[in-house]
Amino acid sequence: EVKLEESGGGLVQPGGSMKLSCVASGFTFSNYWMNWVRQSPEKGLEWVAEIRLKSHNYATHYAESVKGRFTISRDDSKSSVYLQMNNLRAEDTAIYYCSTGFAYWGQGTLVTV
């Protein structure tokens, strides 16, 4: 059974920082690109960031709205992916999900700015 479990959300002041984590199980984590996506009433579902494989030198890509503020990373030894969020804004308020190429999703973690 594939499981993705996010953590690290909560309430943060504008301009603050927060780090989200996602632990995966039930599949070979190191073989999958990983994404963070978010959902808010105002913007709906929005892709945030992607990190590729070791064979791709862990290449990363970001939505324009978060570029320069958010950093995605992964630790294949821990089957985990992370999202470091800096200089948070009110418009970053959303439920954040990790996903494997949109095939599998976690339950989400709420970030309120």
Swiss-Prot record:
Transmembrane segments: none
Keyword Nucleus: no
Entry's Gene Ontology molecular function annotations: antigen binding
Disulfide bonds: C22-C98
Annotated InterPro entries: Ig-like_dom, Ig-like_dom_sf, Ig-like_fold, Ig_sub, Ig_V-set, IgHV
GO BP: immunoglobulin mediated immune response
Keyword Calcium listed: no
SUPFAM superfamilies linked to this entry: Immunoglobulin (SSF48726)
Family matches, as CDD domains: IgV_H
The entry's keywords: Adaptive immunity, Disulfide bond, Immunity, Immunoglobulin
Any matching Pfam family: V-set
GO terms under cellular component: extracellular region; immunoglobulin complex
Domain Ig-like: 1-113
PROSITE patterns the record matches: IG_LIKE
Note: This chain was isolated from a myeloma protein that binds inulin.
Identification of the protein by name: Ig heavy chain V-III region ABE-47N
